[in-house]
Structure formats: C-alpha cells, structure tokens
Amino acid sequence: MSLKSKLSSNRNPYVVAQQKTFRLIKKYRDEGLSVYNLIFMQVESPLRSNDFFIKKVCIAAKYKKKIIVGNINTYRDYSWVTEIIKAIFLTSNLKAQDYFISAGKKMSGKKILKKAYSLSNLNYKNYFSSNKKYFRINENEILIGSVKNSFYLKNKFNFSFKIFGDRLIKEMYKSL
C-alpha cells in the first residue's frame, strides 16, 4: 500500500473516519495550514487492548491457553509503537504533506501463532483453532506498506524499522 492506493470500500466506522479525516486534512492544507496526514499499518504496543491479534496470541501462548482465531493465512505489516513514534517525530520536521509510515515487511497470522507459542516451548498446532465467524468479510489477504516508504525514511533520516517479525513478537511476549 502507498499514498496512491485506492481508498478502501470497507464501511467499518473506523475506516470511514480515517478516510474523512484524510480528505479534511488535505482541505486544511489547501487553505494554508501546516498539517500532516500520517498513515500507518498495524501499530503494536503492550498498551493496546488484549483483543489486538499479536497481544491476544502472546497472552494465550505465555499462559499456555488455547485460542480461537479467524483466518491465519492473511499477511499484515506490523510495526512497534516506539519506532512509529520516532518516525512521526522525524517526519514532523519535513514539509507538511501526506506520509505513509510502515516497515514494509509482511507477517502471517500463522507465523505469529507459531513464534508466540514457540516462546513457551509449545507447538502452536495444539493450542489454536480457527473459526469462520472470526473471518472478516471482504478481507484483503495481504496488506503491507510499500517498501518505498521504508526506503524514503532510510534515505532521508538513516532510519529503518528494527522491530518486526520474530523480534516484534518477542517484544510483545516479554512485555506481558
């Protein structure tokens, strides 16, 4: 995904609010205000509620509990909150415009389950089940940020995401 990607047709109130805000910020900028649109993929933090996927899986794995999930064959671009905050700070010193901030790395639900349960020395296959009621309607199989986003941050600020994939899961697991 990039700033040129087509806006989602998802009618989820959260998505609708994001789209309206994106358009409104552009109007404010056209009127001379110095405002930014910063778009992120999945931002992970131990401070988020327990129903966010990676945190939910890590809690179940740490306490050796079984978990019911939806589609584990989807891929998302997850970033760690402290790195996102650093990227926000860096882009705030640039010209006000739209920025898409993401690690540009994909990770599947299956990999998250496998890694989290391995941290407890467990085989994830014995601790999860998938239920169609948790599948999202019209869900995109792969949602990752364009690698151009990562290259831009690297070239402009010598900044790159270091916490993603296995390390991100370990950070979440350790934080619980």
Predicted regions and their residues:
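Ser/Thr-glycine-rich phosphate-binding loops at phosphate-binding pockets of nucleotides
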Residues: 1, 17, 171
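Alpha-helical hydrophobic/aromatic positions enriched in membrane-embedded helices and signal peptides
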Residues: 7-10, 31, 72, 86
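Flexible, glycine-rich beta-alpha linker
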Residues: 3-13, 36-56, 75
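C-terminal substrate-binding subdomain of Rossmann-fold SDR/epimerase-dehydratase oxidoreductases
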Residues: 61-176
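Residues in soluble alpha-helical coiled-coils and helical-bundle/repeat scaffolds
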Residues: 30, 48-49, 159
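Active-site Tyr-X1-5-Lys
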Residues: 10-36, 58-63
